[in-house]
A protein has these predicted regions:
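Bacterial N-terminal signal peptides
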Residues: 2-14
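Signal peptide processing junction and immediate N-terminal pro/mature segment
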Residues: 14-19, 208
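N-terminal pre-domain segments of enzymes
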Residues: 20-50
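Active-site mouth of glycoside hydrolases
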Residues: 46-330, 334-360
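A general structural signal for short secondary-structure junctions and capping/turn motifs
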Residues: 95, 140, 205-208, 352-356, ...
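Catalytic-core region of carbohydrate-active enzymes that cleave or remodel glycosidic bonds
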Residues: 197-198, 321-342, 348-370, 383-562
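Short, charged, surface-exposed secondary-structure boundary motifs
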Residues: 372-378
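Long, low-hydrophobicity ectodomains and other hydrophilic envelope-associated domains
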Residues: 488, 493-773
Length: 773
């Protein structure tokens, strides 16, 4: 049987069809709903009726009326926001149907967006059409019960027409100049004032007065430490300005050159402070923070990398960054802004993220399970790791990497995430983020992203593309159900907390990176703080050395001796249990299992024909890779629920897509030889070996229960299907036609219409029909 397309599900559940705004000749695009279920009723309309969002003392978001707030949403970025109002309305309706309660409007200052065309002489004026469309977005989101999140400095291109000196030499976003140059900070404030205090003609509200504006980001992927190599290539007059600030800081700290020299001491027989360096003459160099930078004078490089100079340099830059954040924060509050504020820097550098936790209301960061890599030798080709993220349990895995955000008991927002196309293991990404965002009790999770029109690379929105999941059944197809599980706390947060303690004397050590200790986040909640002592073994001090691995063993064993189902054995077996017992990660097998009273998930690499028992969910399948989710929609345990949904996704590619092994010297193991185009195919076909699904308790009165006849069988490999069971009726959608299956032993065959089955109370089948919604 030939592969069928994900658009079949769209036809069954109601398409949202739009024409591209960049030309009437472009084809109509249908955006599939995430699920056949309509979750819009879970949203309270309009957004903001509980008052402005605030931060609580317990490190979570609350509304003004005391209700705790959690968010699950998506990003719409840059030129993807530039679509007609009727299309905006339909996209937002699709988000509401998915039950999303937050949308981040990202990079609105990008080229050809709010600040005008790329060839505009300055970046001081708003483009009227783009602003109008942005106003439509904000108003439509508010009306549908969806909160919105705004960035201020993303990719703004400062120009000579702004009276910015050497603007042409700056990267987009003016990294890192925008952190310390007074005029650039003034321009950022002017931009923020114009954006946040303009009156939206559709809502009648200024954003600062709109409680649907839930979060504001001062700067996106910025800071001194995200790209430290930029400090080596600063242009004038900014280079001299930063150097002078550094020397004045040293003078204020040490008083005299002699005291500075004594504090910095010697390295390899040479004084760290060179003879020609004197803070009084503003001649002391900043440290060299990047390992990759090749200095023509090796001895000079060593002196600039001396630990005392490094520590002082990192502290100086951290304090300067804090001044910037505090200045911007205070200015935004002076405008009347009531929404919580953050800035996005590098969460794997302790002083960097600590500076945000000190000055802002919450911390935020990205996590990606795969990224695009380029090779100048092969322009046009893109390279990917194409690995299964569930096989990664090191510090760069989703839980350890994002756990680095938890500082000062501030709320945590994963404001961008995704395992991007064409990674073949994307179907694990939603379960993985859901599991560990729940375990760590994060406050917002926002998928990146959603394409609405033709992309700059020419890809239409009906195709899989870079950071675009709107037609991806393996990601977007799970996003609504995963969101409901997150928003209803279907997975418990961790019962225990591990604290990473950074002594003040070592906070500014360089190089800085995530520690092996962050891996404890696979099992318990992880937080970080600056302190001088550790109360017990649940608190450990990262050193950035191999000793951190031994500290991790001690930490895991500490909890294990107190009855928690974890120990250092996870480091060798690759099996990680959450302290709640609800999440099990099989790193060596590339599989994740989640079992709670109302939710069961089996995701990852599977052994065909093997029976997997995940709580009340029991699955056997011919697929070697899949995600299957069962969720109770009425809050009752899965086996007793009267309203539940079961969904299975496997793989999805563009038509004619070709992902090949890359040459050995390529930057990543796989290359995208041909991107392909829409429609998306899922390769569903008939199979002699069926997928079998049971929803039954494993034990009754403490005794094992033999499995009865399967609830559902599907004689299919690959493909996507979803079944809702409610009030004596089952409704099954499958993106592949002519697939034989059974429900409680009764045969059916899929078609391009939904199969609807009715039951009596004791599961007796009384009829089968095919119907369109």
């Amino acid at each position: 049987m030939s592969a069928l397309v994900f658009a079949v599900l769209t036809a069954l559940t109601g398409p949202a069809a739009f024409a591209s705004d960049t030309g009437s000749a472009h084809k109509l695009v249908s955006y599939p709903p995430s699920s056949q279920l309509d979750f819009s009723g879970t949203l309270e309309t309009p957004a903001g009726q509980h008052g402005f969002l605030t931060t609580g003392a317990n490190g979570h978001f609350y509304f003004a009326d005391g209700k705790r707030a959690r968010f699950w949403g998506i990003n719409v970025s840059s030129t993807r926001l530039d679509i007609p109002p009727d299309q905006i309305e339909r996209v937002v309706e699709n988000f509401a149907r998915a039950g999303l309660n937050m949308v981040r409007l990202e990079a609105i200052d990008n080229r050809n967006c709010l600040l005008g065309k790329v060839d505009s002489p300055d970046s001081l004026h708003f483009d009227g059409r783009y602003l109008d469309r942005l106003d439509h977005w904000m108003d439509s989101l508010r009306r549908h019960g969806i909160y919105y999140y705004l960035d201020l400095l993303d990719f703004r291109t400062f120009k000579s027409g702004d009276n910015v000196l050497n603007a042409r030499e700056m990267d987009r976003g003016a990294r890192p100049y925008a952190l310390y140059d007074d005029y650039l900070i003034q321009l950022q404030q002017d931009y923020a004032k114009r954006l946040l205090t303009h009156k939206n003609p559709y809502s009648g509200l200024m954003p600062v007065n709109d409680p649907a504006l839930a979060m504001v980001e001062i700067c996106n992927e910025h800071g001194f430490f995200l790209y430290p190599e930029k400090l080596e290539t600063l242009v004038e007059p900014y280079r001299t300005d930063l150097r002078n600030r550094w020397n004045r800081w040293l003078r204020d700290r040490y008083g005299t050159r002699e005291k500075l020299q004594a504090a910095w001491g010697d390295i390899n027989g040479f004084t760290v402070l060179r003879d020609d360096e004197d803070p009084e003459r503003l001649s002391v160099d900043l440290p060299l923070l990047t390992r990759a930078f090749a200095n023509a004078d090796p001895m000079a490089a060593d002196i600039r990398r001396a630990p005392p100079r490094l520590r002082d340099g990192v502290q100086f830059l951290t304090e300067l960054q804090r001044t910037y954040l505090r200045t911007m924060r205070d200015y935004l509050f002076s405008l009347g802004l009531q929404a919580p504020i953050t800035a996005v820097v590098s969460n794997d550098v302790a002083p960097d993220i600590w500076s945000v936790a000190q000055e802002c209301d919450f911390t935020a960061e990205n996590w990606y399970g795969d990224t695009i890599k380029d090779d100048p030798r092969t322009p046009g080709l893109r390279y990917y790791s194409n690995h299964n993220p569930l096989r990664e349990d090191g510090p760069l895995g989703v839980a350890p990497f994002t756990a680095g955000l938890r500082w000062n008991n501030k709320p945590v927002v994963i404001r961008e995430w995704g395992t991007i196309w064409p990674n073949r293991y994307r179907a694990v990404s939603e379960p993985e983020l859901l599991a560990y965002a729940s375990l760590q009790d994060y406050d917002a999770v926002l998928l990146f992203g959603y394409q609405t029109n033709r992309a700059p690379n020419g890809a239409e929105a009906d195709a899989l593309n870079d950071y675009a999941f709107q037609v991806d059944p393996t990601v977007w197809g799970l996003h609504a159900i995963a969101g409901q599980a997150f928003l209803t706390h279907a997975i418990r947060s961790a019962d225990h907390t591990a604290t990473l303690v950074y002594p003040p004397a070592h906070l500014y050590d360089w190089p800085a990176h995530l520690s092996e200790l962050h891996r404890a986040s696979w099992s318990v909640r992880v937080q970080s703080r600056v302190a001088t002592s550790r109360p017990d073994a649940s608190a450990q001090t990262p050193t950035g050395t191999l000793s951190d691995l031994q500290s991790l063993r001690e930490l895991l064993n500490y909890f294990g001796k107190r009855g928690v189902p974890i120990s250092e054995k996870s480091l060798t077996t690759g099996v990680w249990h959450s302290d709640t017992g609800q999440i099990t990660r099989y790193d060596h097998d590339g599989r994740l299992e989640v079992s709670t009273p109302t939710l069961a998930i089996l995701s990852g690499e599977l052994e065909p024909g093997h029976l997997y028992d995940v709580g009340s969910l029991h699955v056997s399948t011919a697929n070697r890779f899949a995600t299957i989710v069962a969720y109770s929609l009425d809050g009752l345990p899965l086996a007793r629920s009267r309203h539940r949904v079961i969904k299975m996704v496997t793989r999805a590619e563009n038509s004619e897509e070709q992902l090949d092994r890359a040459p050995k010297d390529a930057p990543a193991p796989w290359q995208l030889t041909t991107a392909g185009a829409g429609p998306v195919v899922t390769f569903g076909s008939g199979s002699i070996a069926p997928t079998k699904v049971w929803i039954e308790p494993q034990r009754v009165n403490g005794k094992p229960v033999p499995l009865p006849l399967p609830l559902l069988t599907m004689d299919m490999v690959s493909g996507t299907w979803e079944m809702e069971l409610a009030a004596g009726t089952a409704r099954l959608l499958c993106d592949t036609v002519e697939i034989h299956g059974t429900l409680h032993g009764r045969d059916f065959t899929t078609s391009d219409e939904a199969v609807v089955m009715k039951f009596e109370k004791k599961k007796k089948l009384i009829g089968i029909t095919a119907a369109k919604q």
